[in-house]
Swiss-Prot record:
Highest taxon listed in the record's lineage: Eukaryota
Comp. bias regions, Pro residues: 502-516, 701-724
Family matches, as SMART domains: PDZ (SM00228)
Protein name (Swiss-Prot/TrEMBL): Synaptopodin 2-like protein
Gene that specifies this protein: Synpo2l
InterPro entries (UniProt xref): PDZ, PDZ_sf, Synaptopodin_domain
Keyword Chloroplast: no
Sequence ranges of Low complexity compositional bias: 202-214, 530-540, 571-580
Alphabetical UniProt keywords: Actin-binding, Cytoplasm, Cytoskeleton, Methylation, Phosphoprotein
Family: Belongs to the synaptopodin family.
An MF annotation (GO) of this entry: actin binding
């Protein structure tokens, strides 16, 4: 048994003290230091028996009493311990202990002035107040010695700085006698400083005390890495505390980084980066920075559309479309990013919307019990159902307020409060009526104040397209209206007021002929078709040019009497997810013009319905782009080829049979561009050019409408339903691809039409062809004229150039464009100053020309010579300054005339060409005689040379390079 000594250890700094106790009277064992962590720096060792705490003897204390006494001590704890040392064993000394060799050893001279050490003489070891000894832990172990086998856990490190190897320990106050004598035999290994990473066990080495100047240093310098904490017993190497943990705990601490794949690491990094960005955007250091403001603006705008998951609109204060609403610091700021700077935010993104909607739950609670929709949704539970119910109540209440403000009109015996019930149904039954006026079929807006025409409801202004309507300047093209229909047919009948399938619920007045309904809503369930005539054409003149978008009701011919057939029931209509565009046929001359009534402002609930509910995604654009690569541009129409086409055209279309003719009712983007006008066919760039723009999903762009020629009473053709495209594809009353079949002329196949032929040819990349020098139809006017153009934008006798293209947009500087024609850039406009051309010149071989500029327009290559018979129209009037403002996609409103106008072609700015034919400008300046409209059409088509506004036939000419066409802009016809 070794010698015993009493050591007094002073710990300062406050709890935790950095050691553990075991034993006590309840275990019949003395209180013993079971384990010490940072308290070892003050000289405390394991297995030290506790004799006194702060001068109070604790030999008969229980464990709990000793811990209470230790906890009661304030900033300083004085422990008196008894230490038993084994004589023969080499131990690792405490780092704070100054070792003094035994005087029996010949190699250990006594330090000068040190008295002889005696056993059981207390040693006072004091550590400084800020050392690591006070940031360990002091916890109680009542479970006895069995806990000694428990694996060690890593302790919380304090902020104190560990020492370097060889550096002195923290301050040590030595008592009068040295610490316990450790006899070291000669030749036996002695241990150096226990903080050395690799301790030396050299033979005969004696422990030297640290230098005196090292004792004056309060702290050692910083040492990276874990410091070594000695253990008690015959351990040859001092082991660090970190090395005593088990492998399981080490793996948990390391979080098994070795098992993390590269993908998980990237996902983790991306998530951290996203959270950092989100926290910077929501809890930004500078909340007025541009990025934060843009984020908040877009988030406010996105809130209106992300609520479609449960069909509720954004807050009532968020009605403005572009600006940041007053509540720009939205609920997301408070809830989602309340803990924004901590990057472990897992809050529910839907909770702010739910709280926002539940806050309005008191709005019309009693009405929800009696509503038809509430009866349906009562069997289902969930957040979406609740929010649908609240939205329906809001719609009903807003419509009631509207009914109190406006006159209490009746719509087929049903009051204004009832239709909005049909608007808040689950979106599975939502149908998308596409109308430029955006009037839902069950909208509470239209009413008949004096038995007059239905009132159009003004809606959101679509800035990209306007109908060219003479009398509808106040009406604007709107976004898509979404009409909800409940799934059950009985609820639909209740919501729609038990309308019958055949008649329109908004009946026109019986004084005049029934106008065409603007759209027909096709419902997938057993709902009746309701067409609203609220957006029917109205003008001060009999001929109108409003273009309407129709939901598929393809078989809708107009009888020669002018009265249209009733809307087709849904059994006859095509139940497709796509929609067709029908250009509305103008009424006959005997039709009484209807003046539009005063517009009723649209309630906010209708706009909320449109915003909060997703438009039915038809996939029109995606299908068109997918088909555009493999489908031919035109429908073949082979069954109609009864007459043999021109040999001139046959020579140009020889290569068209390389691609298979695609049939069916579908259409691609090439056909979309074709229906913009024959000029637009020849400049379409592949799927991303200026002529084919990507349309928005929610509100399809209204096509650039063209005033159609008044058709003669012929047998109506019913084109199959096709996807909506920016042109007049499925025209009523026999309009085939935008052109009117003339009376007495058998209708040619749709592939006839020079622009269409050349465009299809260029689409198939068959660019090796030669334009004929002379054409039989131009030299011999007695021959039958060419077949009508695929589009009504140019007369049938007009010849197209394969290099024709559209002009650039308004904000486009053509002189800086690589596509701007060189001749137009360098040569003056001499087309007006030249005299009439009599003799046609030799045609140019397009191969030589297109090798250098394959798809650019050479304006000097046009020679406007019709022959000696028509010298007048070849030189157009000089260009005059434009008075009216020219906006993109819009032309000034035509002045309403009492007489039917001659075939006027209004093409928007994006569909015109740099070389617009001169006949269009001549229309604006030459007084047009007004014969019978149908007769003028027939004579215009049958005898081109006898007509007052005959069109020149441009041809290729390699030598006449100084000619340039008259450029027509959209305001040319209305000055």
């Amino acid at each position: 048994m070794g010698a015993e000594e009493e050591v007094q250890v002073t710990l300062a700094g406050g709890a935790p003290w950095g050691f553990r106790l075991q034993g006590g009277t309840e275990q019949r064992k003395p209180l013993q230091i079971r384990r010490r962590s940072q308290a070892g720096r003050a000289g405390l060792r394991e297995r030290d028996q506790l004799l006194a705490i702060n001068g109070v003897s604790c030999t008969n204390f229980s464990h709990a009493s000793a811990m209470t006494l230790i906890d009661a001590s304030g900033r300083q704890l004085v422990l008196t311990v008894r230490r038993v040392t084994d004589e023969g064993s080499v131990r690792s000394p405490s780092p704070g202990e100054l070792q003094v060799l035994s005087p029996l050893s010949p190699l250990s001279p006594e330090p000068p002035g040190a008295p002889v050490s005696q056993a059981l003489q207390p040693t006072s070891l004091r550590s400084p107040p800020d050392s690591e000894a006070y940031y360990g832990e002091t916890d109680s172990d009542v479970d006895g010695p069995a806990t000694q086998e428990k694996p060690r856990r890593t302790r919380r490190r304090g902020p104190a700085r560990p020492s370097l190897p060889g550096a002195p320990p923290d301050e040590v106050y030595l008592s009068d006698s040295p610490a316990e004598p450790a006899p070291v035999k000669t030749g036996s290994p002695s241990q150096g400083d226990s903080r050395v990473s690799s301790p030396s066990w050299e033979e005969g080495a004696a422990l030297q005390p640290p230098p005196a100047e090292a004792l004056l240093l309060p702290h050692g310098p910083l040492r990276p890495g874990p410091h070594l904490i000695p253990m008690v017993g015959p351990v040859p190497h001092p082991v660090a505390e970190d090395l005593t943990t088990t492998y399981t705990q080490k793996a948990k601490q390391a979080k098994l980084q070795r098992a993390e794949s590269l993908q998980e690491k990237s996902v983790k990094e991306a998530r951290t980066k996203c959270r950092t960005i989100a926290s910077l955007l929501t809890a930004a250091p500078n909340p007025h920075s541009k990025g934060v403001l843009m984020f908040k603006k877009r988030r406010q705008r996105a809130k209106k559309y992300t609520l479609v998951s449960f069909g509720a609109a954004a807050g009532t204060g968020t009605e403005e479309e572009d600006g940041i609403p007053p509540t720009s610091e939205s609920e997301l700021d408070e809830e989602t990013f309340s803990d924004a700077r901590s990057l472990t935010n897992q809050s529910d993104w839907d909770s702010p919307y739910l709280d926002m909607e539940l806050a309005r739950a008191g709005l019309g609670t009693a009405e929800s019990q009696n509503s038809g929709l509430g009866g349906q949704l009562s069997e289902v539970s969930g957040r979406g159902v609740q929010l649908f119910e609240q939205q329906r109540q809001r719609v009903a209440s807003s419509s009631q307020e509207l009914a109190q403000v406006g006159p209490a009109a009746m719509l087929n015996g049903q009051s204004l409060q009832s239709p909005p019930r049909a608007q808040s149904a689950p979106p599975e039954a939502a149908v998308l009526p596409l109308s430029p006026l955006s009037v839902p079929a069950v909208s509470p807006t239209p009413f008949f104040p004096d038995g007059g025409a239905p009132i159009p409801a003004p809606s959101i202004f679509n800035r990209s397209a306007r109908p060219f309507t003479p009398g509808l300047q106040g009406q604007r093209s709107g976004t898509t209206s979404v009409i909800f229909r409940p799934l059950a047919p009985k609820k639909v009948n209740e919501g729609l007021g038990s309308t019958s399938p055949a008649p329109s619920p908004f009946a026109a007045p019986p004084q005049g002929p029934t106008p065409l309904p603007s759209f027909t809503t096709v419902v997938p369930s057993h709902t009746p078709v309701s067409g609203a005539s609220s957006s029917t054409q109205r003008s001060s003149g009999p001929v109108t040019a409003t273009s309407s978008l129709y939901i598929p009701a393809p078989s809708r011919p107009v009888t020669p009497g002018g009265a249209p057939e009733p809307p087709t029931p849904p059994s006859a209509a095509a139940m497709t997810s796509t929609a067709s565009i029908f250009l509305s046929t103008p009424l006959r001359n005997s039709a009484r013009p209807e003046a539009p009534g005063p517009a009723v402002p649209e309630p906010a609930s209708v706009r909320e319905q449109r915003i909060s509910v997703p438009a039915a995604r038809t996939g029109i654009l995606q299908e068109a782009r997918r088909r555009g690569t493999r489908k031919q541009m035109f429908r073949p129409g082979k069954e109609e080829t009864k007459n043999s086409p021109n040999p001139e055209l046959l020579s140009l279309v020889q290569n068209l049979d390389e691609k298979p003719r695609a049939g069916g009712a579908e259409s691609g983007p090439e056909e979309d561009a074709l229906s913009l006008g024959a000029e637009a066919c020849n400049f379409m760039q592949p799927l991303g050019g200026r002529s084919y723009k990507t349309l928005p999903q929610v509100s399809p762009k209204t096509p650039p409408p063209m005033a159609p020629k008044t058709p003669p009473p012929t047998t109506p053709k019913t084109p199959p339903p096709v996807a909506p495209k920016p042109g007049s594809r499925g025209l009523l009353d026999g309009l085939v691809n935008g052109s009117t079949p003339m009376v007495g002329i058998p209708e040619p196949p749709r592939l006839q039409g020079r622009g269409g032929e050349l465009f299809a040819k260029r689409q198939s990349r068959a660019d090796r062809y030669v334009v004929e020098a002379t054409s039989g139809s131009s030299l011999n006017p007695g021959l039958r004229p060419r077949s009508p153009s695929p589009t009504p934008s140019l007369p049938p006798s007009w010849k197209y150039s394969p290099n024709i293209r559209a002009p650039p947009p308004i904000a486009y500087n053509p002189l800086l464009s690589p596509f701007f024609p060189q001749a137009a850039r360098t040569l003056p406009n001499k087309a007006q100053s030249q005299g009439p051309r009599v003799t046609p010149k030799q045609g140019i071989k397009a191969l030589d020309f297109m090798r250098h500029q394959p798809y650019q327009l050479k304006t000097a290559m046009f020679c406007f010579d019709e022959g000696s018979s028509t010298p007048g129209p070849t030189s157009g009037p000089p260009k005059t300054a434009r008075v009216q403002e020219i906006r993109r996609f819009s032309t000034p409103a035509p002045q309403p005339t009492a007489e039917p106008l001659a075939p006027t072609v209004l093409v928007p700015r994006a569909a015109t060409t740099l070389d617009e034919p001169i006949w269009r400008a001549e229309l604006a300046s030459t007084p047009v005689p007004n014969p019978d409209h149908q007769e003028s059409l027939r004579s215009f088509a049958a005898a081109p040379s006898s007509c007052g506004f005959q069109v020149a036939r441009p041809r290729f000419s390699a030598t006449r390079t100084g000619l340039q066409a008259h450029v027509w802009r959209p305001g040319a016809g209305h000055q």
